[in-house]
C-alpha cells in the first residue's frame, strides 16, 4: 500500500477517499484480508464507505463470486462507485446507495458472506462534519442491530464477519444468539493488550477458532503476522 494525498494504492487497485468521511484505515484492511471467502459466491459489504473491503474481497474471491456493496451516504457511495469502476473487478462488484437495514430486509437472494466495519465512536466525540458524525456514531444503531440485519439475508451455511474495538466486540458476543465461529484478537504492538476483535458469526453451531494477530513488533516494525495477512495488498510487502 502506498499513501497519496487523496487515497491509497494497493498492489492491484487504488482507493480514492477524498469524498468520504471515514478514510482508508487499518480496521478495514484487517477485515478485508481476514474474512473467510471460501465457498462464497454471493458476498455483501454493509456500509462499504470507500469500497475498500468490497474490492479486497473481490481480489481474494473466485471469478464466479459477486460482491454487493451498500452505502447510505451519497458522497461515499459515489466515491465507492468510482473506485469500483477503476478496479479490475468492475463487472463483479455492485454498489448501492441504500440504508443497510432496508437492503437486508428487501434482499431477494441470500448471501454466503456478509462483512461490516460498523461505526463505533460513542456520542460526545466532536466530529468535524455531520457526514463524519453519520459515519462514526453508534447512537442510532447498535452493533447487534447490524448483526441482526445481516442475519436476515444470510444463507443457511453463510458467515458474518465484523471488526470492532475489543470491548465493543465483547459486548456484542453477549448480546447475540448467533454462533461465534472465529475470534481473532488484534494486538497493535507486541506485549500490549488487544485493541480490536475480528469476529465471524454463523447460524450453525461450529467449534470456535480462536487466534491472535500482532500488527507491530517491539521495534515498531510490521510483525510477521500482519505481513502474512496483508502481503497480497501492501506494496511494501
UniProtKB/Swiss-Prot annotation:
GO terms for cellular component: cytoplasm. It is an enzyme of class 2 (transferase). The keyword Coiled coil does not apply. Gene3D superfamilies: Vaccinia Virus protein VP39. CDD domains: AdoMet_MTases. One of its GO terms (molecular function) is tRNA (adenine-N6)-methyltransferase activity. Its main location: cytoplasm. It catalyses: adenosine(37) in tRNA1(Val) + S-adenosyl-L-methionine = N(6)-methyladenosine(37) in tRNA1(Val) + S-adenosyl-L-homocysteine + H(+). It is found in: Cytoplasm. Its EC number is 2.1.1.223. Coiled coil: none annotated. One of its GO terms (biological process) is tRNA processing. InterPro entries: DNA_methylase_N6_adenine_CS, SAM-dependent_MTases_sf, Small_mtfrase_dom, tRNA_Adenine-N(6)_MTase, tRNA_adenine-N6_MeTrfase. Keywords: Cytoplasm, Methyltransferase, S-adenosyl-L-methionine, Transferase, tRNA processing. Belongs to the methyltransferase superfamily. tRNA (adenine-N(6)-)-methyltransferase family. Specifically methylates the adenine in position 37 of tRNA(1)(Val) (anticodon cmo5UAC). This is tRNA1(Val) (adenine(37)-N6)-methyltransferase. It comes from Pasteurella multocida (strain Pm70). The lineage of its organism: Bacteria, Pseudomonadati, Pseudomonadota, Gammaproteobacteria, Pasteurellales.
Amino acid at each position: 500500500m502506498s499513501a497519496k494525498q487523496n487515497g491509497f494504492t494497493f498492489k492491484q487497485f487504488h482507493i480514492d477517499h477524498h469524498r468520504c468521511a471515514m478514510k482508508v484505515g487499518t480496521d478495514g484492511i484487517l477485515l478485508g484480508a481476514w474474512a473467510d471467502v471460501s465457498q462464497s459466491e454471493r458476498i455483501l459489504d454493509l456500509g462499504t464507505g470507500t469500497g475498500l473491503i468490497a474490492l479486497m474481497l473481490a481480489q481474494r474471491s473466485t471469478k464466479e463470486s459477486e460482491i454487493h456493496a451498500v452505502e447510505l451516504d451519497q458522497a461515499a457511495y459515489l466515491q465507492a462507485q468510482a473506485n469500483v469502476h477503476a478496479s479490475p473487478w468492475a463487472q463483479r462488484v455492485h454498489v448501492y446507495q441504500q440504508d443497510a437495514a432496508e437492503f437486508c430486509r428487501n434482499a431477494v437472494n441470500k448471501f454466503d458472506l456478509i462483512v461490516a466495519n460498523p461505526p463505533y465512536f460513542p456520542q460526545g466525540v466532536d466530529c468535524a462534519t455531520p457526514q463524519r458524525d453519520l459515519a462514526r456514531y453508534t447512537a442510532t444503531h447498535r452493533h447487534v442491530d447490524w448483526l441482526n440485519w445481516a442475519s436476515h439475508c444470510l444463507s443457511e451455511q453463510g458467515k458474518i464477519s465484523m471488526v470492532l474495538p475489543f470491548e465493543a466486540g465483547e459486548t456484542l458476543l453477549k448480546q447475540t444468539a448467533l454462533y461465534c465461529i472465529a475470534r481473532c484478537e488484534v494486538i497493535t504492538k507486541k506485549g500490549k493488550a488487544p485493541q480490536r476483535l475480528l469476529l465471524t458469526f454463523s447460524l450453525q453451531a461450529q467449534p470456535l477458532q480462536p487466534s491472535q494477530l500482532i500488527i507491530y513488533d517491539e521495534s515498531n516494525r510490521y510483525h510477521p503476522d500482519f505481513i502474512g495477512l496483508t502481503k497480497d495488498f501492501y506494496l511494501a510487502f
